[in-house]
């Protein structure tokens, strides 16, 4: 199947997927702990019959049972060498079932999911290794005859991108992708539905959507959000409600086919046009939704508005149109002219990069430009490190800025959002090499109207260059909305008409539907009091239609002027933005005054008087003598390192704190523990997501490793409470379990982590040998949660007094109560609170 054929196939009527595979195989006798693909091949008729029933029920796209048939997952069963033959035989089952069609077209989708290994910086997996793993599986699926590919049940947008990139590089099959969202409308890694939809459509997915986690009604908001920012078909593949265990310990779901079908109407109304079922659904579910919606044409829901552009990080989307409010692309993460930043980058230190990112976001930037162009460093490696560090402290979308195509390609490949590329000109190398790369990764780009001949001699030549690049972009599948034209600002000191020419370019671009950008500082080069010139020019440019500018958002006069101009032009919500910014200006001034007072007081303590200079700031060079206690300042610095997840810098900060006279026990109890507790609160409130939680926990762990020898030297002999933690037998998921272990360690527990797929006997034996106060159990699958019941019962029978706490995606408080566990934890932060409460 070609992508064009897929578009034609899905354009008029609702399309039907199949329902659950795993829960039906369990009913048919598949035990937990086995390799699902191997069991299917050993019980071929069971799978064939199930898929034939789906086809008879009305399925148009049948998922081949290759869900975890990748090298990493199969290696857990020592079957990785059999991957190719296994995939070939598994796809053959689905092809045979699809051939038994009752008269409607049926296509077989090669099924792909997460590997279970996490990408850097949260895990150890490198992006290129992950892409290679997916390529191996995809090539096997293509060779086996899959008609299309499905990437499903994804919790990570970055890993979903890796799968799409792999597919794009080895085949031309259409790829559909669905992610799994939590109750808060975000994936486990913090991506919302709009952001996922924008990124995956721009990367070339033929259809996108959601599967698993919830029943149909709870999926409505996710589907609506995806529909509102895309033009491709939207998939809805919900569970049959919520799981529970019946009196026999069998996993069941709380929705019957009739109720499920009724609720699916909500998703159809929201704009879903490809329907199916996930956990707990059967061929009868598919039959009923097919009977309900089979002859209906697609519901026309509100799709992506005309002319709206989208830039994203991994976690948020910034949308804008030509008549929306002006915004700033922060320019400060650029070593040009910044000696301190250059020195840090040569040392591999990214503290100032992080500082500039945080400051620019606080000052109102909506996008951050990242430029690592300088001598004496590996620019590509520094760019990738900067992306990692900046993405860890801000959710703002990024602009990728380099003179080298290979640097931009590496950045686009690794960046897990939709970036802005700065920039593409008509210069031969960038035009011929860079533009196809931008198109491949679905980015937006700044169109710089330069050619090999240099600057255009007049506005007409500038227009000609713009349209040449635009035409080439269209031929690569891009749209006008993917382009931001640079107005090419020259200095008014050398060319008195420079401002007028740029303003004419801006007006021309807006009238022709192009977004625009410019670098403000060029206009005032070599002029006195440059800020006045920049601000006046910005006012004129916004009135002419300027969309955004690359500038320093910490310049209050410039930012205030921009927001006031929007206000006077009566742009939507301009008054609210102006009032909000003005309030922030007041707060920042008060903070500066307080900082001034604090530093003056510190100097006076040493008998040094410093008179105010008329400014509200004191140079950062003004510090107290080295022998001055800096307890408050050092504590705040260490706390910030935990809150920001500064894994690399916190060791240095901890050592500095110790050298300044801080006591290890006070750093632990008064700084680190309160900081990580605050991180947990932010996570509970939805301010932080899994990446920030992991980064902060690892930062704290690195700090504790410095303190631990000093703490042990002077401790009172009090033993730490022992926790034996494991993912139960048959379950190979450990993301959540690993984080719980890390958080418990950070709070002073002695954690014995047994890993994943751990037999009951080993868990109980370890608990007895180590006199554990707690046994912590994790399960992600409904097929393995029964192991928890068995462990609780066995522990009581053997007289083990350790308190048993449980958690995992399918676990609830009700289930914990039912099996007699001592507690249930919904996440890592909650696990710490639970353990402490059970010790009281």
Ranges and model annotations:
Residues 1-484, 490-840:
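Domain-level signal for soluble alpha/beta catalytic cores
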């Amino acid at each position: 199947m070609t992508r064009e054929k897929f578009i034609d196939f899905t354009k008029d009527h609702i399309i039907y997927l199949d329902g659950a595979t795993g829960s039906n195989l369990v009913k048919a006798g598949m035990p937990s702990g086995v390799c699902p693909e191997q069991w299917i091949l050993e019980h071929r008729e069971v799978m064939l019959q199930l898929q034939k029933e789906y086809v008879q029920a009305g399925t148009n796209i049948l998922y081949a049972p290759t869900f975890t048939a990748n090298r990493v997952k199969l290696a857990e069963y020592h079957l990785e060498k059999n991957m190719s033959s296994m995939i070939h035989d598994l796809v053959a089952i689905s092809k045979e079932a699809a051939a038994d069609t009752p008269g409607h077209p049926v296509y077989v989708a090669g099924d792909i999911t997460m590997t279970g290994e996490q990408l850097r910086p949260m895990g150890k997996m490198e992006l290129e290794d992950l892409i290679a793993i997916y390529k191996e599986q995809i090539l096997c699926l293509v060779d086996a005859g899959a008609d299309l590919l499905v990437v499903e049940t994804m919790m990570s947008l970055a890993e979903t991108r890796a799968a799409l990139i792999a597919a794009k590089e080895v085949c031309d099959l259409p790829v559909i992708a669905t992610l799994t969202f939590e109750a808060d409308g975000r994936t486990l890694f913090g991506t919302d539905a709009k952001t996922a939809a924008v990124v995956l459509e721009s990367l070339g997915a033929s259809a996108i959507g959601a599967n698993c986690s919830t029943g149909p009604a709870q999926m409505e908001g996710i589907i609506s959000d995806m529909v509102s920012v895309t033009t491709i078909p939207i998939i809805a593949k919900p569970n049959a409600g919520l799981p529970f265990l019946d009196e026999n310990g069998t996993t069941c779901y709380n929705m019957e086919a009739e109720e499920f079908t009724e609720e699916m109407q909500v998703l159809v109304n929201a704009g879903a046009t490809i329907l199916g079922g996930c956990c707990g659904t059967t061929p009868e579910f598919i039959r009923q939704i097919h009977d309900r919606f089979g002859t209906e044409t697609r519901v026309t829901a509100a799709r992506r508005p005309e002319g709206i552009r989208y830039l994203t990080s991994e976690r948020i989307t910034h949308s804008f149109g030509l008549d929306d409010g002006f915004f700033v692309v922060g320019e400060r993460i650029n070593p040009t002219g910044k000696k301190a930043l250059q020195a840090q980058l040569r040392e591999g230190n990214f503290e100032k990069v992080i500082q500039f990112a945080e400051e620019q976001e606080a000052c109102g930037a909506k996008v951050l430009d990242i430029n690592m162009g300088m001598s004496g460093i590996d620019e590509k490696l520094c760019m990738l490190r900067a992306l990692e560090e900046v993405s860890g402290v801000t959710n703002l979308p990024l602009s990728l800025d380099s003179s080298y195509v290979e640097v931009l390609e590496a950045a686009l490949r690794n960046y897990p959002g939709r970036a802005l590329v700065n920039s593409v000109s008509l210069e031969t190398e960038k035009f011929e090499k860079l533009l196809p790369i931008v198109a491949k990764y679905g980015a937006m780009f700044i169109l710089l109207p330069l050619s090999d001949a240099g600057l255009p001699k007049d506005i007409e030549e500038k227009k000609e260059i713009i349209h040449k690049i635009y035409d080439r972009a269209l031929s690569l599948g891009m749209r006008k909305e993917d382009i931001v034209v640079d107005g090419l600002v020259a200095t008014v000191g050398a060319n008195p008409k420079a401002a007028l020419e740029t303003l004419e370019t801006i007006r021309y671009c807006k009238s022709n539907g192009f977004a625009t950008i410019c670098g403000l500082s060029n206009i005032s080069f070599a002029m006195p009091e440059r800020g006045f010139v920049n601000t006046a020019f910005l006012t004129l440019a916004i009135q002419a239609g300027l969309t955004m500018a690359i500038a320093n958002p910490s310049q209050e006069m410039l930012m205030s002027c921009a927001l006031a101009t929007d206000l006077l032009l009566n742009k939507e919500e301009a008054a609210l933005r102006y009032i909000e910014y003005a309030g922030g200006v007041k707060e920042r001034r008060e903070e500066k005054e307080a900082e001034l007072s604090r530093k003056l007081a510190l100097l006076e303590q040493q008998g040094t008087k410093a008179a105010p200079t008329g400014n509200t700031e004191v140079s950062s060079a003004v510090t107290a003598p080295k022998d001055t206690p800096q307890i408050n300042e050092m504590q705040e610095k260490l706390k910030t390192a935990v809150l920001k997840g500064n894994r690399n810098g916190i060791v240095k900060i901890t050592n500095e704190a110790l050298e300044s006279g801080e006591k290890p026990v006070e750093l632990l109890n008064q700084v680190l523990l309160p900081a990580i507790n605050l991180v947990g609160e932010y996570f509970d409130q939805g301010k932080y997501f899994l990446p920030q939680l992991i980064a902060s926990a690892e930062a704290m762990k690195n700090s504790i490793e410095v303190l631990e020898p000093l703490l042990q030297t002077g401790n009172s002999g009090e033993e730490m409470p022992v926790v034996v933690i494991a993912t139960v037998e048959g379950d190979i998921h450990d993301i959540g379990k690993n984080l719980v272990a890390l958080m418990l360690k950070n709070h002073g527990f002695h954690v014995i982590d047994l890993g994943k797929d751990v037999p009951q006997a080993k868990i109980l034996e370890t608990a007895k040998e180590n006199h554990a106060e707690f046994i912590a159990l994790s399960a992600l699958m409904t097929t393995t949660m029964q192991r928890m019941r068995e462990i609780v019962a066995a522990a009581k029978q053997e007289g083990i007094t350790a308190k048993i706490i449980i958690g995992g995606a399918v676990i609830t408080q009700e289930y914990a109560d039912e099996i007699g566990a001592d507690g249930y934890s919904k996440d890592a932060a909650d696990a710490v609170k639970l353990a402490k409460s059970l010790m009281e």
